[in-house]
């Protein structure tokens, strides 16, 4: 998104920055408390100065209807709305510049359970109507299962498994992914003892292991795992950062 510059390496994006937008985790803190909702929704266009105030107001009304906000509420301030309504406003703002990609950073974790499903279903509908690509960041496997076509599992900032959602979520291959999914509550499925984590502290980003980042906590760790791993493609097409899982 360009908000932080990388300390090393590079990232490449195509064309204008407007093709990417973001929906943040906490809708209240991501909305300007002093602006009316219609101004918030069209803020990307106001910054770009590509349209008149009348055009922006009309667009705000159109997007408000799409996300389930009544147009007559557009002159209100953010504090007058519920958490779910604020997130709908944030989604409308992300749509206003007609992006190709929207980054969703834990879009439902700050919301009540009763509202989460509504927001997820809204996102699915908008994706179909606008042809959007989502980059969804979440720790909630149920949300990932509901929303994702492809899944990347990360551990200490590294992708350890990448593949189709069906592959990764039903037949995880990397030891960390297996532990992650096995930790989900299940009535008739106890956690296998041999897959229990070793009693070690989670390393911080200043004291990362020299080899595989998961080496000190992995139940399958053996000689060879102390060597730094890179992503490799398995026969089924998924990418793994574990030589034992290939």
Regions found by a protein language model. Name each.
Residues 55-72, 181-182:
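Conserved ABC ATPase "signature" region
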Residues 164-246:
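Charged, flexible cofactor/metal-binding loops and thiol motifs
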Residues 96-100:
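A short, proline-enriched helix->beta-strand linker immediately N-terminal to the Walker B motif
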Residues 26, 33-47:
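Q-loop/switch helix immediately C-terminal to the Walker
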Residues 77-81, 85:
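Conserved ABC ATPase signature
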Residues 107, 111, 115-193:
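P-loop NTP-binding/switch modules centered on Walker-like glycine-rich loops
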Residues 102-105:
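Catalytic Walker B motif of ABC-type/P-loop ATPase nucleotide-binding domains
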């Amino acid at each position: 998104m360009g908000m932080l510059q990388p300390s090393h390496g590079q990232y490449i994006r195509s064309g204008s920055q407007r093709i990417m937008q973001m929906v943040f985790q906490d809708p209240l803190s991501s909305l300007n408390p002093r602006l009316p909702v219609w101004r918030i929704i069209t803020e990307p266009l106001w910054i770009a100065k590509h349209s008149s105030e009348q055009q922006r107001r009309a667009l705000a009304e159109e997007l408000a209807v799409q996300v389930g906000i009544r147009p007559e509420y557009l002159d209100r301030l953010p504090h007058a709305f519920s958490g779910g309504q604020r997130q709908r406003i944030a989604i409308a703002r992300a749509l206003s510049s007609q992006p190709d990609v929207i980054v969703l950073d834990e879009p439902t974790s700050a919301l009540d359970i009763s509202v989460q499903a509504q927001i997820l279903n809204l996102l699915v509908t908008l994706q179909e109507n606008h042809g959007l690509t989502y980059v969804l960041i979440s720790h909630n496997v149920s949300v990932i299962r509901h929303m994702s076509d492809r899944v990347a599992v990360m551990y200490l900032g590294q992708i350890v498994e990448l593949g189709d959602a069906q592959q990764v979520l039903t037949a995880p291959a990397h030891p960390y992914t297996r532990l992650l999914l096995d930790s989900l509550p299940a009535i008739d499925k106890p956690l296998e003892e041999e897959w229990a984590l070793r009693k070690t502290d989670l390393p911080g980003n200043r004291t990362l292991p020299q080899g595989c980042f998961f080496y000190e906590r992995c139940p399958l760790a053996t000689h060879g795992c102390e060597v730094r791993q890179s992503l490799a493609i398995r026969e089924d097409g998924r990418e793994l950062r574990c030589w034992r899982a290939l």
